[in-house]
């Protein structure tokens, strides 16, 4: 007969504490890369859509993660992560 696994180390922190910590980190990073009025509008949209619920917290975490990922991938000016724009040769001299 199957048995539940025994104690396997320290307890993980509760999901809601983890989610709030992640949200705080994402907010701190987002204000360094996006205009505050724009982020405020996003927060208002999430609040109007989800109210003050955990579903809203999850939604804003997901959206901020996606926005920051795309922002870094396109190439943030004050980050070394991202696509480095290549210079284009006008006359095509470097083509093989």
Swiss-Prot record:
Annotated stretches, region: Homooligomerization: 1-42
Chain positions found as Phosphoserine: 79, 94, 96
Top-rank taxon, per record: Viruses
Gene3D superfamilies: 6.10.210.10, VpR/VpX protein, C-terminal domain (1.20.5.90)
A Pfam family reported for this protein in Swiss-Prot or TrEMBL: VPR
UniProt KW keywords: Activator, AIDS, Apoptosis, Cell cycle, Host G2/M cell cycle arrest by virus, Host nucleus, Host-virus interaction, Ion channel, Ion transport, Modulation of host cell cycle by virus, Phosphoprotein, Transcription, Transcription regulation, Transport, Viral penetration into host nucleus, Virion, Virus entry into host cell
Record-level GO cellular component terms: host cell; host cell nucleus; host extracellular space; virion component
Posttranslational mods: Phosphorylated on several residues by host. These phosphorylations regulate VPR activity for the nuclear import of the HIV-1 pre-integration complex.
One GO term of the biological process aspect: protein homooligomerization
Main location group: virion
Cellular location(s): Virion; Host nucleus; Host extracellular space
Record's keyword annotation contains Ion transport: yes
Similarity field: Belongs to the HIV-1 VPR protein family.
Subunit structure: Homooligomer, may form homodimer. Interacts with p6-gag region of the Pr55 Gag precursor protein through a (Leu-X-X)4 motif near the C-terminus of the P6gag protein. Interacts with host UNG. May interact with host RAD23A/HHR23A. Interacts with host VPRBP/DCAF1, leading to hijack the CUL4A-RBX1-DDB1-DCAF1/VPRBP complex, mediating ubiquitination of host proteins such as TERT and ZGPAT and arrest of the cell cycle in G2 phase.
Function description: During virus replication, may deplete host UNG protein, and incude G2-M cell cycle arrest. Acts by targeting specific host proteins for degradation by the 26S proteasome, through association with the cellular CUL4A-DDB1 E3 ligase complex by direct interaction with host VPRPB/DCAF-1. Cell cycle arrest reportedly occurs within hours of infection and is not blocked by antiviral agents, suggesting that it is initiated by the VPR carried into the virion. Additionally, VPR induces apoptosis in a cell cycle dependent manner suggesting that these two effects are mechanistically linked.
Other comment: HIV-1 lineages are divided in three main groups, M (for Major), O (for Outlier), and N (for New, or Non-M, Non-O). The vast majority of strains found worldwide belong to the group M. Group O seems to be endemic to and largely confined to Cameroon and neighboring countries in West Central Africa, where these viruses represent a small minority of HIV-1 strains. The group N is represented by a limited number of isolates from Cameroonian persons. The group M is further subdivided in 9 clades or subtypes (A to D, F to H, J and K).
Protein name in the entry: Protein Vpr
Species the sequence originates in: Human immunodeficiency virus type 1 group M subtype F1 (isolate VI850)
Upper classification of the organism: Viruses, Riboviria, Pararnavirae, Artverviricota, Revtraviricetes
This protein's encoding gene: vpr
């Amino acid at each position: 007969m199957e048995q539940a696994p025994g104690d396997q180390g320290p307890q993980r922190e509760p999901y809601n504490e983890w989610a709030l910590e992640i949200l705080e980190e994402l907010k701190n990073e987002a204000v360094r890369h996006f205009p505050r009025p724009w982020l405020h509008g996003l927060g208002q949209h999430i609040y109007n859509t989800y109210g003050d619920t955990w579903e809203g917290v999850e939604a804003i975490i997901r959206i901020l993660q996606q926005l920051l990922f795309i922002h870094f991938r396109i190439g943030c000016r004050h980050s070394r992560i991202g696509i480095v724009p290549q210079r284009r040769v006008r006359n095509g001299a470097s083509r093989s």
